[in-house]
Amino acid sequence: MPMDQQVSMRQIRTLNTIGIYHQGTTTDFLYENDRCEEIIERLKLYRSLGVPVGLGTHRPDVIEQSEREGWPVDFYMACMQNARRNREGEPSGFITGKTKAHLVFYPEDRPLMLECLKKVEKPVIAFKLFAGGQIFSGKTPEEKCSAIKNVYEEVFGSLKENDLGAIGVFQRDQNQLKENAALYDEWYESRKKNERS
């Protein structure tokens, strides 16, 4: 059963939060079912907290509509992969309990979202840069490093200077946090060097 927004707001008020956003799969579900007014009403409710309000989505067309209609948001949480393919109109798996085991991400999704984000002046937090690890499937460690740097180039080369990229890590088998940070530093230094040339 979906969480009661009023109850959630009372709980959030006690936490000294620095921002809040409308969860992406819920945004997309409401959008796909022609219930955008509910999204807008929730955003207005979130605004009462007095902190920046964001909108999460997996769909570029949601951001385009939000921008066109002036929805009350300060930032976007934009998934680089459209997790709504083949699930359009369905509620979030967090609500239904439906597994995501067969969820497949498509490489053509990332450029579509990045193209949309180039037109947005508001700050963006891009996430699922590595397609939930699917871009590494069948790759050697060296190929994985190259794939990571290619994604950094594509994503960070497209985002605005103050936008963010959120990268998930799985620490059980190796220190992915350290590896990702080192690869980012390598990529960034190489990019700066190329810009100076």
Where do the language-model regions lie?
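Hydrophobic faces of well-ordered beta-strands that scaffold small-molecule active sites
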Residues: 20-22, 53-55, 76-78, 125-127, ...
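Surface-exposed cleft-lining segments at the edges of enzyme active sites
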Residues: 21-35, 47-52, 92-104
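Active-site glycine- and acidic-residue-rich loops that bind
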Residues: 1-3, 51-65, 98-110
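Glycine-enriched alpha-helix->loop->beta-strand junction motifs that scaffold or abut catalytic
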Residues: 14-18, 47-49, 68-77, 119-123, ...
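Structured C-terminal cap/extension of enzyme domains
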Residues: 111-197
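Short, acidic/polar
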Residues: 2-12, 59-61, 147-155
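Histidine/lysine/aspartate-rich catalytic loop segments that bind and position anionic ligands
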Residues: 71-96, 104
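Active-site beta->alpha loop and helix N-cap motifs at the rims of alpha/beta catalytic domains
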Residues: 1-34
